[in-house]
Amino acid sequence: MELRAYTVLDALQPQLVAFLQTVSTGFMPMEQQASVLVEIAPGIAVNQLTDAALKATRCQPGLQIVERAYGLIEMHDDDQGQVRAAGDAMLAHLGAREADRLAPRVVSSQIITGIDGHQSQLINRMRHGDMIQAGQTLYILEVHPAGYAALAANEAEKAAPIKLLEVVTFGAFGRLWLGGGEAEIAEAARAAEGALAGLSGRDNRG
């Protein structure tokens, strides 16, 4: 088994929580809870990680995703210590350390100002979060591995009053869509990409 992404979110932000509550297949997280996200390969092995974490802690699983190549598990609790213990249990099952994760790699980063109303319609039809209006600024981030998109979203929301449109935390790449004012989006983008740059891990230059 390969550890791809590993990250602990210290305090889930309101929009990210609302988004996760929309797409959650398990137990819904609440605002300000701590969360751990672990992405591995092969995907089917994520069932074993869920088992290890649940038997070691009182954390609840919000997401357990098994797709073609990779698997993702999200677990949360009010107590950050419990969340870190759940992460430790999953790492122990993998025979891995946090340092064995892949370092995040930003694949693409785009800011589009003054978005046209036709494009805002396209985005609003596919999003699970807030909506973007014509004339606002759109930010799109693509990151590898996919699980790190949640960290980018959480830190962006901490930094600026933006709209969280969509987050994809599984698959070949993670993706984040934000909307809002131009200055606010610029600040959120800096925070998101800065958080990713601050995570250590195995070389991931692609």
UniProtKB/Swiss-Prot annotation:
Disruption phenotype: Not required for efficient BMC formation; when deleted from an artificial operon (Hoch_5815, Hoch_5812, Hoch_3341, Hoch_5816, Hoch_4425, Hoch_4426, Hoch_5814) being expressed in E.coli, a 2-fold decrease in BMC formation is seen. It comes from the Bacteria. The keyword Transferase does not apply. It is found in: Bacterial microcompartment. The keyword Flavoprotein does not apply. One of its GO terms (cellular component) is bacterial microcompartment. A motif (Pore gating residues) lies at residues 67-68. Residues 2-104, 105-206 form the BMC circularly permuted domain. Artificial BMCs can be made in E.coli by expressing (Hoch_5815, Hoch_5812, Hoch_3341, Hoch_5816, Hoch_4425, Hoch_4426, Hoch_5814) or (BMC-H (Hoch_5815), BMC-P (Hoch_5814), and 3 BMC-T (Hoch_5812, Hoch_5816, Hoch_3341)). Cargo proteins can be targeted to this BMC. Keywords: Bacterial microcompartment. These proteins have 2 BMC domains which evolve independently of each other, giving the term pseudohexamer to the trimerized subunit. Although the homotrimer fills the approximate space of a BMC hexamer protein, the BMC-T trimers are more compact. Their universal presence in BMCs indicates their structural importance. The homohexamers form pores of at least 5 Angstroms in diameter; in the stacked homohexamer both pores are closed. In the BMC the inner pore is fully or partially closed while the outer pore is closed. Belongs to the EutL/PduB family. Homotrimerizes to form a pseudohexamer. These stack, with the concave faces together, with the concave faces together, in purified bacterial microcompartments (BMC). A minor component of the bacterial microcompartment (BMC) shell. Expression of 5 proteins in E.coli (BMC-H (Hoch_5815), BMC-P (Hoch_5814), and 3 BMC-T (Hoch_5812, Hoch_5816, Hoch_3341)) forms 40 nm artificial BMCs with a molecular mass of 6.5 MDa. One of 2 stacked pseudohexamers in the BMC. There are 20 BMC-T pseudohexamers per BMC, composed of mixed BMC-T1, BMC-T2 and BMC-T3. The shell facets are 20-30 Angstroms thick, with 1 of the stacked BMC-T trimers protruding to the exterior. This is Bacterial microcompartment protein trimer-3. It comes from Haliangium ochraceum (strain DSM 14365 / JCM 11303 / SMP-2).
